[in-house]
Amino acid sequence: MAYYWDMPEATAKAFRNGWLHTGDIGVMDEDGFFYIVDRKNDMLISGGYNVYPREVEDVLKEFPGVAEVAVVGLPDEKWGDRVVAVVAGSGELDSDAIMEFAKGRLSGVKRPKQILVWPELPKSGANKILRRSVRDTLVNEKRTA
């Protein structure tokens, strides 16, 4: 890839010193294989700490009945981003029980301040959860509330 079509600012931001900066966060295993684990652009900053949504989502998915999770940051005057989780799954999901479950597994800054239960999460054509759509819905709900 040489550039973004008709997007000179995005091209300048992504290409620096001949390298393409994708915004992906990866890890290398002991055999030298790389795995993409998150996106830097999805990272939240809450109280000055980096919070990776994927890390929080992985913990919340361990709760019985939770099939899907989207963790987003909502604007907060004090913390910068307020960590909010939206879950979907089977049966009756209790947000208080999920919150209690998270207390033993996540540090305070990473623990969601609010957990919402939705019937399903918005997805792309490739069946990926659309965090941005979740965030936009929550921000718009707050504006109209």
Regions found by a protein language model. Give the residues of each.
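AMP-binding/adenylate-forming catalytic core of the ANL superfamily
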Residues: A2-D6, A10-K13, I25-K110, P119-E120, ...
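FAD-site-proximal beta/loop scaffold in flavoenzymes
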Residues: G18
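Acidic/polar alpha-helix N-cap and adjacent early helical turns
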Residues: D136-A145
